[in-house]
């Protein structure tokens, strides 16, 4: 985790998206969920933008809301930060999707669309510090 923090601080990014895969004790759980830095408005907006695109994926079986999280990667810098949990490896059907290049491309494109949506929002809204 320290190495990731060093990379973030050295890069001085406009935002941070850390991509992960989830695991849960109940194997029927599936879908993508985004966590954001608690108390940070821009992180929350970024999470909402990405989550809304994830929820529109045809493979999505339910809509998630982004959740505030108290995780090291979210709190280690001043930049808007989210963790994108892109699916559940504990769900055999979703795991089968997650290993395919086609589904990985869908996830990557969803992340891209969510980031672009967020950047458009903060660029055009003078109330939001970008």
Where are these regions (language model features)?
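Active-site-proximal helix/loop segments of hydrolytic enzymes
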Residues: 1-130
């Amino acid at each position: 985790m320290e190495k990731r923090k060093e990379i973030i601080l050295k890069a001085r990014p406009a935002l941070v998206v850390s991509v992960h895969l989830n695991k849960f004790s109940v194997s029927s759980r599936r879908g993508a969920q985004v966590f954001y830095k608690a108390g940070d408005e821009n992180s929350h907006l970024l999470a909402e933008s990405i989550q809304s695109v994830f929820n529109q994926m045809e493979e999505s079986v339910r809509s998630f809301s982004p959740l505030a999280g108290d995780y090291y990667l979210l709190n280690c810098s001043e930049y808007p930060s989210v963790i994108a949990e892109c699916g559940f490896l504990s769900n055999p059907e979703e795991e089968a999707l997650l290993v395919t290049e086609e589904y990985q491309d869908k996830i990557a494109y969803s992340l891209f669309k969510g980031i672009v949506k967020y950047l458009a929002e903060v660029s055009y809204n003078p109330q939001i510090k970008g």
